[in-house]
Amino acid sequence: MLSPRAIGTALIGIMLTAVPARADTLLIPFFGVNFGGDAGTEFSDAFDTSQFNWGVSIAFMGGGIFGVEGDIGYSPDFYGKTDVGGSGVLTATGNLVIGIPFGGQQGFGIRPYGIVGAGLLKSKSDFGTGVTDIDENDLTWSAGGGVMMFFGTRAGIRFDFRYFQTFDDLEILGVPIAQSPGKVDFSRASLGFVLRF
Protein backbone atom coordinates (compact mmCIF):
# COMPACT_ATOMS: atom_id res chain seq x y z
CA MET A 1 0.00 0.00 0.00
CA LEU A 2 1.27 3.44 -0.95
CA SER A 3 1.64 6.02 1.75
CA PRO A 4 0.15 9.50 1.37
CA ARG A 5 3.70 10.87 1.35
CA ALA A 6 4.69 8.65 -1.62
CA ILE A 7 1.53 9.64 -3.53
CA GLY A 8 2.17 13.34 -2.84
CA THR A 9 5.80 13.04 -3.96
CA ALA A 10 4.71 11.23 -7.14
CA LEU A 11 2.09 13.92 -7.93
CA ILE A 12 4.60 16.73 -7.40
CA GLY A 13 7.10 14.89 -9.60
CA ILE A 14 4.51 14.53 -12.38
CA MET A 15 3.55 18.23 -12.17
CA LEU A 16 7.18 19.35 -12.28
CA THR A 17 8.13 17.10 -15.18
CA ALA A 18 8.95 19.21 -18.20
CA VAL A 19 6.50 18.78 -21.04
CA PRO A 20 8.33 18.84 -24.38
CA ALA A 21 7.63 22.03 -26.28
CA ARG A 22 5.70 21.50 -29.48
CA ALA A 23 6.89 23.00 -32.75
CA ASP A 24 4.30 24.52 -35.08
CA THR A 25 4.22 24.68 -38.86
CA LEU A 26 1.90 27.42 -40.10
CA LEU A 27 0.45 27.85 -43.60
CA ILE A 28 -1.07 31.31 -44.05
CA PRO A 29 -2.80 32.43 -47.27
CA PHE A 30 -3.51 36.18 -47.04
CA PHE A 31 -4.96 39.22 -48.80
CA GLY A 32 -4.70 42.90 -47.99
CA VAL A 33 -3.86 46.44 -49.07
CA ASN A 34 -0.67 48.37 -49.78
CA PHE A 35 -0.27 51.97 -48.67
CA GLY A 36 2.34 54.68 -48.18
CA GLY A 37 5.58 55.09 -50.08
CA ASP A 38 5.25 54.04 -53.72
CA ALA A 39 1.87 52.32 -53.31
CA GLY A 40 -0.66 53.97 -55.61
CA THR A 41 1.99 55.79 -57.68
CA GLU A 42 1.06 55.80 -61.37
CA PHE A 43 3.78 55.27 -63.96
CA SER A 44 3.79 57.21 -67.25
CA ASP A 45 0.41 56.85 -69.01
CA ALA A 46 -0.85 54.24 -66.56
CA PHE A 47 -4.12 54.58 -64.68
CA ASP A 48 -6.11 52.61 -62.11
CA THR A 49 -3.38 51.63 -59.69
CA SER A 50 -4.39 48.78 -57.45
CA GLN A 51 -3.42 48.68 -53.80
CA PHE A 52 -4.67 45.12 -53.36
CA ASN A 53 -2.23 42.31 -52.52
CA TRP A 54 -2.40 38.58 -51.93
CA GLY A 55 0.04 35.82 -51.13
CA VAL A 56 1.08 33.06 -48.77
CA SER A 57 3.40 32.68 -45.80
CA ILE A 58 4.86 29.45 -44.46
CA ALA A 59 6.28 29.66 -40.94
CA PHE A 60 7.97 27.23 -38.61
CA MET A 61 7.79 28.20 -34.94
CA GLY A 62 10.07 26.26 -32.62
CA GLY A 63 8.99 25.07 -29.21
CA GLY A 64 9.64 28.53 -27.74
CA ILE A 65 9.26 32.03 -29.09
CA PHE A 66 11.61 31.92 -32.11
CA GLY A 67 10.83 30.87 -35.65
CA VAL A 68 11.49 31.40 -39.35
CA GLU A 69 9.13 32.31 -42.16
CA GLY A 70 9.01 32.43 -45.94
CA ASP A 71 6.63 35.07 -47.33
CA ILE A 72 5.55 35.60 -50.95
CA GLY A 73 3.23 38.48 -51.83
CA TYR A 74 1.96 39.81 -55.15
CA SER A 75 0.44 43.20 -55.89
CA PRO A 76 -1.20 43.37 -59.35
CA ASP A 77 -1.28 46.76 -61.13
CA PHE A 78 0.96 48.25 -58.43
CA TYR A 79 2.08 51.03 -60.81
CA GLY A 80 -1.22 51.07 -62.72
CA LYS A 81 -2.31 49.67 -66.05
CA THR A 82 -3.00 50.83 -69.60
CA ASP A 83 -5.30 49.54 -72.33
CA VAL A 84 -2.38 47.39 -73.52
CA GLY A 85 -0.84 46.00 -70.33
CA GLY A 86 -0.28 46.31 -66.62
CA SER A 87 2.26 46.14 -63.85
CA GLY A 88 2.96 44.24 -60.69
CA VAL A 89 5.25 43.91 -57.70
CA LEU A 90 6.29 40.55 -56.25
CA THR A 91 7.99 40.23 -52.86
CA ALA A 92 9.70 37.05 -51.67
CA THR A 93 11.38 37.29 -48.27
CA GLY A 94 12.83 35.06 -45.60
CA ASN A 95 12.18 36.33 -42.08
CA LEU A 96 13.12 35.71 -38.49
CA VAL A 97 10.08 35.62 -36.20
CA ILE A 98 9.72 36.27 -32.49
CA GLY A 99 6.25 35.36 -31.21
CA ILE A 100 5.00 34.67 -27.70
CA PRO A 101 2.14 32.12 -27.52
CA PHE A 102 -0.40 33.17 -24.88
CA GLY A 103 -2.73 30.30 -24.08
CA GLY A 104 -0.30 27.64 -25.22
CA GLN A 105 0.20 26.03 -28.59
CA GLN A 106 -2.97 23.95 -28.63
CA GLY A 107 -6.56 25.09 -28.54
CA PHE A 108 -7.52 28.75 -28.23
CA GLY A 109 -4.56 31.11 -28.06
CA ILE A 110 -3.12 34.45 -29.10
CA ARG A 111 0.40 34.97 -30.45
CA PRO A 112 1.68 38.53 -30.98
CA TYR A 113 4.83 38.52 -33.09
CA GLY A 114 7.46 40.63 -34.81
CA ILE A 115 9.42 39.88 -37.99
CA VAL A 116 12.54 41.11 -39.72
CA GLY A 117 14.01 39.75 -42.91
CA ALA A 118 15.30 40.27 -46.43
CA GLY A 119 14.72 38.96 -49.92
CA LEU A 120 13.69 39.93 -53.44
CA LEU A 121 11.37 42.65 -54.71
CA LYS A 122 10.53 42.28 -58.41
CA SER A 123 8.96 45.28 -60.17
CA LYS A 124 7.55 44.67 -63.64
CA SER A 125 5.46 46.70 -66.03
CA ASP A 126 4.38 46.10 -69.61
CA PHE A 127 2.48 49.20 -70.69
CA GLY A 128 3.24 48.62 -74.37
CA THR A 129 5.28 51.81 -74.73
CA GLY A 130 8.72 50.23 -74.38
CA VAL A 131 10.15 53.46 -72.96
CA THR A 132 8.57 53.28 -69.52
CA ASP A 133 8.44 49.50 -69.14
CA ILE A 134 10.42 48.14 -66.19
CA ASP A 135 11.68 44.71 -65.22
CA GLU A 136 13.84 44.98 -62.09
CA ASN A 137 14.93 42.56 -59.39
CA ASP A 138 16.06 44.37 -56.24
CA LEU A 139 17.20 43.22 -52.81
CA THR A 140 14.72 44.31 -50.18
CA TRP A 141 14.39 44.23 -46.41
CA SER A 142 11.17 43.93 -44.47
CA ALA A 143 10.09 44.50 -40.89
CA GLY A 144 6.75 44.36 -39.15
CA GLY A 145 4.53 42.43 -36.84
CA GLY A 146 1.03 41.49 -35.94
CA VAL A 147 -1.04 39.02 -34.01
CA MET A 148 -2.33 35.51 -34.68
CA MET A 149 -5.50 34.31 -32.97
CA PHE A 150 -6.26 30.59 -32.88
CA PHE A 151 -9.83 29.34 -32.45
CA GLY A 152 -8.73 25.75 -31.96
CA THR A 153 -5.71 23.55 -32.38
CA ARG A 154 -5.66 23.74 -36.20
CA ALA A 155 -7.16 27.06 -37.40
CA GLY A 156 -6.96 30.77 -36.77
CA ILE A 157 -6.53 34.20 -38.33
CA ARG A 158 -3.58 36.58 -38.65
CA PHE A 159 -3.56 40.38 -38.69
CA ASP A 160 -0.24 41.49 -40.19
CA PHE A 161 1.60 44.75 -40.97
CA ARG A 162 4.90 44.89 -42.90
CA TYR A 163 7.13 47.56 -44.36
CA PHE A 164 9.22 46.79 -47.45
CA GLN A 165 12.12 48.88 -48.76
CA THR A 166 14.71 48.08 -51.39
CA PHE A 167 18.37 48.61 -50.66
CA ASP A 168 19.64 51.54 -52.73
CA ASP A 169 23.27 50.63 -53.35
CA LEU A 170 24.66 47.93 -51.06
CA GLU A 171 28.32 47.04 -50.74
CA ILE A 172 29.93 44.53 -48.40
CA LEU A 173 33.71 44.85 -48.02
CA GLY A 174 33.83 46.92 -51.20
CA VAL A 175 31.98 44.31 -53.27
CA PRO A 176 28.74 45.61 -54.82
CA ILE A 177 25.88 43.36 -53.74
CA ALA A 178 22.94 45.44 -54.99
CA GLN A 179 22.81 48.37 -57.36
CA SER A 180 19.36 49.84 -57.57
CA PRO A 181 18.28 52.68 -59.84
CA GLY A 182 16.00 53.96 -57.07
CA LYS A 183 14.34 53.07 -53.82
CA VAL A 184 10.98 51.29 -53.79
CA ASP A 185 9.11 51.27 -50.50
CA PHE A 186 5.59 50.61 -49.28
CA SER A 187 3.63 49.18 -46.36
CA ARG A 188 1.36 46.15 -46.47
CA ALA A 189 -1.55 45.35 -44.16
CA SER A 190 -3.17 41.95 -44.54
CA LEU A 191 -5.60 39.45 -43.08
CA GLY A 192 -4.66 35.78 -43.29
CA PHE A 193 -6.24 32.42 -42.55
CA VAL A 194 -3.85 30.32 -40.45
CA LEU A 195 -3.61 26.54 -40.70
CA ARG A 196 -1.50 25.05 -37.90
CA PHE A 197 0.15 21.62 -38.23
Listing of model-derived features with the role each one plays in the protein:
Residues 1-8:
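Bacterial N-terminal signal peptides that target proteins for export
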Residues 8-18:
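Bacterial N-terminal signal peptides
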Residues 19-23:
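Sec/Tat signal peptide C-region and signal peptidase I cleavage site
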Residues 24-27, 36-47, 183, 190:
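Outer-membrane pore/translocation modules
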Residues 26-28, 57-129, 136-139, 149, ...:
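Gram-negative (and chloroplast) outer-membrane scaffold detector with strong preference
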Residues 34-54, 134-137:
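Surface-exposed strand-loop-strand hairpins of Gram-negative outer-membrane beta-barrel proteins
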Residues 39-45, 78-85, 124-132, 169-176:
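Outer-membrane beta-barrel translocator domains and adjoining extracellular loop/strand segments
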Residues 46-51, 138, 148-157, 162-172, ...:
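Subset of outer-membrane beta-barrel
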